Amino acid sequence: MLAKRIIPCLDIKDGQTVKGTNFVNLRQAGDPVELGRAYSEQGADELVFLDITASHEGRKTFTELVKRIAANINIPFTVGGGINELSDVDRLLNAGADKISINSSAIRNPQLIDDIAKNFGSQVCVLAVDAKQTENGWKCYLNGGRIETDKELLAWTKEAQERGAGEILFTSMNHDGVKTGYANEALASLADQLSIPVIASGGAGLKEHFRDAFLVGKADAALAASVFHFGEIKIPELKSYLCGEGITIRG
């Protein structure tokens, strides 16, 4: 089994880390530079920075903030939000990002996936998908979960893989911030049908939820925000628990 990854996520709004429930009711969760440094020191495997209102508000990700966070961590760093063209990717990689996460822009212009993969390599391109389970299956949403699209989760992630995405970051909007566990059934079907890594997001509340994401959901990595930001779960303790459950963990 490849080592599983634990990934804290900084959801950024107006330069501050925030956390909501089901994509709304945001509350402040701390200084992103300090949080990033702390997670890096505590043994997080990667860090994700999502400027959650950039696509909605139509502005560019905070390049300066990305630079400051990158200077304070020594783990792989993924940045997303408001990335619409190759010049955005170039700017953020130069600011210290290792990978770029695209979401709304890829749904509107799928060719962007091909272009990033061709120009920077598949390993740089993370397709983030915000999906909600409806009566008609899992539907993908745009602009931070504000607009439903006709794209279905499995079909869209398969297309992204074919276009050159190197990783899928799947957030279940039904589970986001609710802390009742990840969408393991959907995760497992993604893992079974894709050959690229899948990151689970949305729903972590207990250490057991991470275990289930790996063992039941077959995820390659598990991302969480509030349980880390508010000190409910500490990364070293989580890793030692997962090792005890027979899961291969980095570090």
From Swiss-Prot:
Organism: Bacteroides thetaiotaomicron (strain ATCC 29148 / DSM 2079 / JCM 5827 / CCUG 10774 / NCTC 10582 / VPI-5482 / E50)
Pathway(s) this gene product operates in, as recorded in its UniProt entry: Amino-acid biosynthesis; L-histidine biosynthesis; L-histidine from 5-phospho-alpha-D-ribose 1-diphosphate: step 5/9
Pfam family, one: His_biosynth
Enzyme Commission (EC) number: 4.3.2.10
Alphabetical list of HAMAP family matching this protein: HisF
Function (record text): IGPS catalyzes the conversion of PRFAR and glutamine to IGP, AICAR and glutamate. The HisF subunit catalyzes the cyclization activity that produces IGP and AICAR from PRFAR using the ammonia provided by the HisH subunit.
Key word Thylakoid present: no
GO cellular component, one term: cytoplasm
One GO MF term attached to the UniProt entry: imidazoleglycerol-phosphate synthase activity
Protein family: Belongs to the HisA/HisF family.
Keywords: Amino-acid biosynthesis, Cytoplasm, Histidine biosynthesis, Lyase
InterPro entries per the UniProt record, alphabetical: Aldolase_TIM (IPR013785), His_biosynth (IPR006062), HisF (IPR004651), IGPS_HisA/HisF (IPR050064), RibuloseP-bd_barrel (IPR011060)
Protein name: Imidazole glycerol phosphate synthase subunit HisF
Quaternary data: Heterodimer of HisH and HisF.
Chief place where the protein resides: cytoplasm
Cellular localisation: Cytoplasm
